[in-house]
Amino acid sequence: MINLPSLFVPLVGLLFPAVAMASLFLHVEKRLLFSTKKIN
């Protein structure tokens, strides 16, 4: 049986920052789209 820390370390160390960056990027893109639509 594999030990859990060796499974969770890459998951938290790689997947969580990737999800955080992706959600932040989408949030900023949405705000930019809405702001440009309001100006036009």
From Swiss-Prot:
Superkingdom per UniProt: Eukaryota
Organism for this UniProt entry: Pisum sativum
Transmembrane segments: 8-28
Family the UniProt entry places it in: Belongs to the PsaI family.
Protein role: May help in the organization of the PsaL subunit.
Gene coding for it: psaI
Major site of localization recorded for this protein: plastid
Location in the cell: Plastid, Chloroplast thylakoid membrane
GO annotation (BP), single: photosynthesis
Annotated InterPro entries: PSI_PsaI, PSI_PsaI_sf
GO cellular component term, pick one: chloroplast thylakoid membrane
Protein name (Swiss-Prot/TrEMBL): Photosystem I reaction center subunit VIII
Residues making up the signal peptide according to the UniProt record: none
One Pfam family here: PSI_8
Membrane topology label: Single-pass membrane protein
Keyword list, A-Z: Chloroplast, Membrane, Photosynthesis, Photosystem I, Plastid, Thylakoid, Transmembrane, Transmembrane helix
Alphabetical list of SUPFAM superfamilies matching this protein: Subunit VIII of photosystem I reaction centre, PsaI
